[in-house]
Amino acid sequence: MKLLYIFEKNIILRKILITFSLIIIFLLGRYVPIPGVLISAYKGQDNNFATLYSTVTGGNLSQVGVFSLGIGPMMTTMILLRLFTIGKYSSGVSQKVQQFRQNVVMLVIAIIQGLAIAISFQYHNGFSLTKLLLATMILVTGAYIISWIGNLNAEYGFGGMTILVVVGMLVGQFNNIPLIFELFQDGYQLAIILFLLWTLVAMYLMITFERSEYRIPVMRTSIHNRLVDDAYMPIKVNASGGMAFMYVYTLLMFPQYIIILLRSIFPTNPDITSYNDYFSLSSIQGVVIYMILMLVLSVAFTFVNIDPTKISEAMRESGDFIPNYRPGKETQSYLSKICYLFGTFSGFFMAFLGGVPLLFALGNDDLRTVSSMTGIFMMITGMSFMILDEFQVIRIRKQYTSVFENEEN
């Protein structure tokens, strides 16, 4: 009874235990095999980028299982829905309608990705349409289960979907440790050391920019003492965080799923395979597109996380203002310039730090997996701060009690 009382009263302990339990379920599901599939003969194991993408999105294509799709379908859905609902179009749509749209789009995307992966399987007693559809259905179901687990964690635990992705990436990087030692023994000592040093520098810069902020002076009408001179609006230097990396991999991988399906339908058409170079990190075209997408998404996520329109409207309603800028459109324009400035800065810095190792490893299949390590750990660093910030909010909230609760005591 005492343990139950502690569990009910200690919100931090309760959230940690719930999150830990959901992580265990998530990790176990990654290794639940799909019936009828020859795991040892899975062709996708040779696709380094597909394996990397599955790791980034919480999946596992190195050893195919029920959760192999990860949260990839949900992330692709969020990107598409955001592209088609830019501005205030979705503001008047009910939550139920938005959820329905998201589920429908996610179902279509999950089927496309599931079919592309299931086609790469080898099956017991040969291939059949029934086995293909069954494997696809299981993969799609696994994607929805992961989405459900992430939503449960967001409501009852902490870290939401982000902590599942971080755990998946950490597990994937631990699996790469034997490969790093093997490359070190095969004569790649200098390359491995340079990659590790570059990754450490990138993580240090990521932490520095993550905790740096630009302070915009704000005149708050509700403050009438000496604190009015100290009021400011903090703008993070790296407002996009580590999310841009994850969405870049999503945008690069989804066309590859389409190409896999088209290649299975038109196996004699050589032009289909040639398009794959534009979305693969093993080609110069793919790396350049990767760096461009990193820049674009960094700017986009800066606007999403700061939202100059919403901030300017809130300031106008409260009577607050930025010195030398009129409330409304002028304030919004000023904040938009700040977003462009820092979004472009963080985009260039992340594209450079994440892209240089990929360029260095071009043409070398052995170093390709290790070269992506910098981007992965930058992503882990950025997402870890998001989780820590949420934990800090919960901890601070726990220090305050309800007024009515104090009166009862």
UniProtKB/Swiss-Prot annotation:
InterPro entries recorded: SecY/SEC61-alpha, SecY2, SecY_dom_sf
Entry's localization field: Cell membrane
Gene3D superfamilies associated with the record: SecY subunit domain
Biological process annotations from GO: intracellular protein transmembrane transport; protein targeting
Keywords, sorted A to Z: Cell membrane, Membrane, Protein transport, Translocation, Transmembrane, Transmembrane helix, Transport
UniProt topology in membrane: Multi-pass membrane protein
Coiled-coil parts of chain: none
Superkingdom per UniProt: Bacteria
Pfam families: SecY
Record-annotated membrane-spanning stretches: 16-36, 61-81, 104-124, 132-152, 161-181, 190-210, 242-262, 286-306, 341-361, 374-394
Keyword presence, Transmembrane: yes
GO cellular component term of the entry, any: plasma membrane
HAMAP family in the cross-refs: SecY2
Similarity section: Belongs to the SecY/SEC61-alpha family. SecY2 subfamily.
Described function: Part of the accessory SecA2/SecY2 system specifically required for export of possible cell wall proteins. The central subunit of a protein translocation channel.
Subunit comment: Component of the accessory SecA2/SecY2 protein translocase complex required to export cell wall proteins. May form heterotrimers with SecE and SecG subunits.
NCBIfam families: acc_sec_Y2, PRK12417.1
Protein's name according to its UniProt entry: Accessory Sec system protein translocase subunit SecY2
Lineage: Bacteria, Bacillati, Bacillota, Bacilli, Lactobacillales
Gene: secY2
